[in-house]
Amino acid sequence: MACMRIYISGPISGQDRIRTVDRFNNTARIIEEAGHRAINPINIAGWGLEWSTYMQIAFDVLQSGEVDMVYMLSGWEESTGASLERYMAIIKGIPVEYQSAEDRKQYKANGGSNGKV
């Protein structure tokens, strides 16, 4: 399998900093151990920016043509930012995969890996 560039999406704003950074970094490590390149938004943007700045950075990355897949961490549906990243991926035709088995089942049943908006 070719090396894919996988953008990690999930709740960040309003979350515990240490747990969130660990969660994203652990996910990135798993992706990289599988031979892919992880695109970790926390490493790109850091911590403590305004929400709108984070979203502009995320949209720029997703529109860059440098993302082959978006990986949605569990709890994404509770996050406006992660939901918008998912929507942007769907619009751009970027495949979306889900950490949660329940999400994978629900969204694949509704039209493939991109699910429904």
Regions found by a protein language model. Give the residues of each.
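Conserved catalytic or regulatory cores that recognize and/or transform ribose-phosphate-containing ligands
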Residues: M1-V117
